[in-house]
Amino acid sequence: MNFNSSKYISHLPESLLPNDASPEWNNKADNAWQLTAATLVGLQTVPGLVILYGSMVKKKWAVNSAFMALYAFAAVLVCWVLWAHHMAFGTKLLPFVGKPNFALSQKFLLSKASTNYYLPMADFVFYQFAFAAITLVLLGGSLLGRMNFYAWMLFVPLWLTLSYTVGAFTIWGNGFLEGKIIDYAGGFVIHLSSGVAGFTAAYWVGPRTSNDRQNFPPNNIIHMLGGAGFLWMGWTGFNGGAPFQVGEITSLAIFNTHLCTATSILVWISLDMAVYKKGSLIGSVQGMMTGLVCITPGAGLVDPWAAILMGALSGSIPWYTMMVLHKKSPFFQSVDDTLGVFHTHAVAGILGGILSGVFAKPKLLRILYGPYGSGLLYSYFDDNIGQGIKQMWYQLLGAVFITIWNVVITSLICILLNRFVNLRMQEEDLEVGDDAAHGEEAYVLWGDGERMRLPLRRDISPIIPYISHQRHSFPINKIDE
């Protein structure tokens, strides 16, 4: 259709006519949905993961865990527009990364996003930032309860620059695997990379204190569920925004996302009840996460029946690796992955990537990408099994590349940082937690008989003047009413 033709423009309602604020190429529906989708993805992190992390950890780490997520979100946005966006989606510098450049000029941000997207570049930049930000925050889930916050402040921009941009450019940008791998919304780029990098960084940072490893109850399960709700509903924008247009792929992706997730939760709960004789709310949140992650690389490219099957597998295979294999394997036991990000994101991400290579429907691939390969299952029935095998080879190649790159680069970043700043907090601070790290605590009232803990950090506390150089708090008996 020729959208420049006066024949079509003359029949448009006045509200849809092009003007100075909305040029002819701008599809207002696509534009509005993309801004909504990007906002939903942002809400997955702030407040979603901020609440989830702050509630899922031991009480003494609530502030630090939430703060790590909030900092990463802010830092990634600044780095993204200053250099990282063009490294991920700009002009090719190397086969796996683009040239760093600003994404700040009005001319650039208000230009058409691409030949296939009828919306401003600003929408694309913001949506991709939200993807990058949540990747760093997911990675941080492996490091909660011991990483030095100053080291985290340096780790975030380094990992974004040296790792995330490479994965995004290689698979989604103009890299050597672009157009070959089926990764609809980030099963490899976001989830496999965050799971592998988080596990690797956890190795270099070292474990939590022995007491924290053995006794690490969530401080507020109900709040944790609220954060999980932001994640689940926010995935409507996560997978629904990936086509960058309002169409049938968007609708199918959203439907499949929630169908797979619900199936995964039910399977996880069933396994918990079969083995441990009772269901677990924390376990159901883990099952929710694995379902969301597994469907992500193929959300708009598979039929609903395949989404149900993917949900069944994402609720069982990561359950086995986390609840059985992790406890038996000396390898897994040697690395303290605080929230099990390796299982919920790396295992579920690679599972989803492989299953997307099996179940991707040729018609849906053509609608979204144009000329493309075919899933293994459909290539078998179409008498073109060679094409399906080739696609599976690319899926495996992508998984191997993302895994190796993240292990190597994350290790180098941690080794480099450790030469300038300690990766983990001092042992005495690890015993105290938030009060030592930030001079703040999550809850004023806590424990039997309810005790009030007042921070003694003089530059923050509005209640008492400077008393001691120690940044710890002391119990004050609650005044009898």
From Swiss-Prot:
Conditions for induction: Accumulates in roots during colonization by arbuscular mycorrhizal (AM) fungi (e.g. Glomus versiforme).
Tissue: Mostly expressed in mycorrhizal roots. Also observed in the cortex and endodermis of non-mycorrhizal roots.
Cytoplasmic side: 58-62, 145-151, 206-220, 270-281, 326-338, 382-395
GO cellular component annotations of the record: periarbuscular membrane; plasma membrane
Gene source species: Medicago truncatula
Location of the protein in the cell: Cell membrane
KW Nuclease (keyword) present: no
Pfam family membership, one: Ammonium_transp
Protein name per UniProt: Ammonium transporter 2 member 3
Topological relation to the membrane, as annotated: Multi-pass membrane protein
Family statement drawn from the similarity comment of this UniProt entry: Belongs to the ammonia transporter channel (TC 1.A.11.2) family.
Phylogenetic placement of the source organism: Eukaryota, Viridiplantae, Streptophyta, Embryophyta, Tracheophyta
